[in-house]
Each structure stands twice: as structure tokens, then as C-alpha cells.
């Protein structure tokens, strides 16, 4: 049986209105068991200042971002279920949901799904890989009862 272990860290001043730990767990469980038996993930919800600092340090981008993924790389002789860390910026997620006309909870779910796929090695730099990743994201989001994250909820179908 697959197991997903979540370490949730809330590092922003106001935790009011954030998804629950059960929400984050549910979203991880929709992704990870498809790929590996046991997974341990840390999700850290941060403010814009911390996101900005990490994005600048690790990606050279001078702005906060929605989600950063840091895969854990164990030495080959050590087997650990640690998959890595997701850093999600509350303000950016909330702002994007408004701008993209998406339900806030659906956008949070998408950030967890998207970041988890990065931890598993998926990327969207090359077009073919982007299409594959987006297809997997859409399928997982729909299995969770959310719409296609790449279509605005107000777009005609």
C-alpha cells in the first residue's frame, strides 16, 4: 500500500484561509502513489519575501513565484523515501487565482500537483515535456474534481 508522509510548515504571518493539512495530504495522495510506494514531502507555505529570496538564490529570478520544488537527492547507497520540498507562496497563489479567474482552492491544488511532478522529475522547459506534464496535471486535477488548470474557468469550452 502506498504511503505519503507530509510535513506541513506554515511560515507566513496569517494562516487564516489556507487549505487544511488534510487538503494538502489529499492532493499529494492524488499524485505520488502513482509513481512510488512511499513518499515523504515537506510543503512550506511562505510569504512573498521568503519566496522572493529563494527564487533569487536558486533560480536567479528577482521576484516571488508561486511554487518552488527542491528534489531530495540521496547518495546512491542510501535509500530514503524523502522526495523533496515544495515552497508555495501564499500571496502569489492568491493573486494568480484572481488574475486567472480560478477558484482559489483549485489553484492551491494545482500548485501542489505541479510542484509534486517537478519533484518526480517532470519539467516544462521543452515543449514535448511541457505537453506531457500538463496532460498529467490535467488528468490528476480532474480526478480530484477540479477543472483543467490551463483553461480559465470563464473561458468558453
Curated annotation (Swiss-Prot):
Cofactor annotation remark: Binds 1 zinc ion.
Main subcellular location of this protein, as a coarse class: cytoplasm
GO molecular function, one term: zinc ion binding
InterPro entries: MetalPrtase_cat_dom_sf_prd (IPR023091), YbeY (IPR002036), YbeY_CS (IPR020549)
Top-rank lineage group of the source organism: Bacteria
E.C. number: 3.1.-.-
BP term (GO), one: rRNA processing
Keyword Zinc: yes
Compartment(s): Cytoplasm
Keyword Mitochondrion set for record: no
Binding site for Zn(2+): 114, 118, 124
UniProt keyword annotations, A-Z: Cytoplasm, Endonuclease, Hydrolase, Metal-binding, Nuclease, Ribosome biogenesis, rRNA processing, Zinc
Pfam family, one: YbeY
Known cofactor(s): Zn(2+)
GO cellular component, one term: cytoplasm
Family listed: Belongs to the endoribonuclease YbeY family.
Function (record text): Single strand-specific metallo-endoribonuclease involved in late-stage 70S ribosome quality control and in maturation of the 3' terminus of the 16S rRNA.
HAMAP family reported in the protein's UniProt record: Endoribonucl_YbeY (MF_00009)
Protein name: Endoribonuclease YbeY
Organism in which the protein naturally occurs: Yersinia enterocolitica serotype O:8 / biotype 1B (strain NCTC 13174 / 8081)
